[in-house]
Structures are given as structure tokens and as C-alpha cells.
């Protein structure tokens, strides 16, 4: 009897296994019902999430929002961008106000383990730096002892700054603001001698200064800042969609697939390529998406390199070198799990 019961339980379990594996995401259902993706972004950070002269959102983090919408709806424009300060961002995600947070956010132990959040991956490897005016003649961080430093509230930046100065017996005068715009104004007016932020953020802040050429970014880097999108814990289906959307963009670059040449690869003899773009595969089903989900991401948004270069790289005013964000095969550490 016991053996028959065990056999019955096993049979039922295996019968249900596909259903459990393909269980619909509650967040995906919500997103489909509302007909758009609610994506949390910054209040304005050039290169990552900012509004252009035509009133359109643009940036590396915005591209991720659009890639996710393209995967879900087949339309990258079905996104509502919700600007959030660093102080507001996690509460907005936890409460369900937004479906995903794509806002230059550092992946840390505490955030990942105590706040009900899941980090999707890394879309920009960064580090904390400092920007000063050229006329200050400051060349290194130690020269900022007892000086006023502008920093954004509720960020790892402030915590790193405290740790760095305490560990070296240095002091500083914190000048704390909620937004990047406020920090730029304070620096322009001379309220602080230096700004500290992720180096990518410093590049963005510098181009928005009244005289960008008057500021210099120091070579000192005091932290690791892996930045990436975030979703709520408790919805593995949605987490999978969010994670593999980023992986598609990175893998597409590695395979040499761009938005421009994508259709030429439909008849490729490379199974990695045909698998990625959905030729004769059903990978989308396991995510609750159509089988051309990856095709739509690449066609409408592009691969990771395309996104990087137009927003923060050589085709942008920021001109940030790829550095660590180059592919692992090109001297960087950018890497995504294989899609197979």
C-alpha cells in the first residue's frame, strides 16, 4: 500500500511538473492586464535614465525597460517610466507601484537578503569616485580632509564615503541631497569642494555643469558598484523573465547579432544563434512568452554593445570607455549565462 501511495504521489508530481515549471507569473499577469510595464527609473541621470530634447526617456537603464516590454508585448514602447529618488526606489518596488526597478542601483548583500528584493544581474560594472573643480588643484582623495563633499542620500555612496574616511583617519563635511540635479547646483554654486558618486554618475553630472571643462574626475576609486535591475522576491517566473532579458542582450553581442543584421541570421548554421532568436525552438514557452521574445528584444532595442555605445559610450556625450563592461572575451568581465 505504501509503495502504491508513493508511486501515485510521484505520478501526480511528474504530471504537475510542467505546470509548476511553467506556472504563470503573478507580476506578468499584472503587467499584461495593465497593458504596460511600470518601470522605476532615476529622476534624471544622463546616459542611464534621462529625458531628451523631444521629451522621450533614454539611457542604458531605459533600454532595459524597453527590452523587457519588447519581450512581453512585442512592443518596446509599452512602458510607463516612473521617476524615483534613491530614497523612494525600494519602497516603490516593494509596494507594487513599479514592476521592475532599472535605476543605476548597486547590488549589495543587505539589499539582496533583507529587503525582499532580487537583483536580476549586472548591466554596468562601476566604482565610486570623486569629481572636483580644476582650480581646486586637488589631485587625490586624501586632500579632501575636512572639506565639504556633496553626496546623494540613501545610497551606498554615503556609506562607502563614511567607511573610507573613517578607516584612514580623515574627516569630511557631508552635504547631502536627494537628487543629482540638486548636487549639480550645489557644486556649481561652490557649496561643496567635491562630488562623490559612481564614476558613471560623475560623467553624467559633469556634462550638465555650467562649465563641464572646469571639473575633473579623480583617478581614485574607493568601491565596487555592480549596478543592475531589481524585482520583488517571491515571483520566480517574473524574475526569470527579467534575468533572461538582460542575458539576451549580452549573448547577442557575443554572437555578433545586432538589430541591423538580425534577420540575416535566421538561416544561420550556428545552433546558438538560431536557438537565441527563436528559430525552431520553444524557449519562450517556459517564460510564458512568445517564442520570438528574444528576437523582439534584439530587433527593437539591440544588443548590449549597441545600448552601451549610444547611451554612455563612443556615440554619446559621456564617452565612457567600456573597461570592465567589455565582454569577457574582450578584456572585460561582462558575461551572461548561455541560452540553451
Q: Could you tell me what each predicted segment is?
A:
Residues 1-9:
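Bacterial N-terminal signal peptides that target proteins for export
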Residues 23-102, 289, 300, 304, ...:
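Extracytoplasmic small-molecule ligand-binding "clamshell" domains
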Residues 273, 279-340:
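C-terminal functional modules
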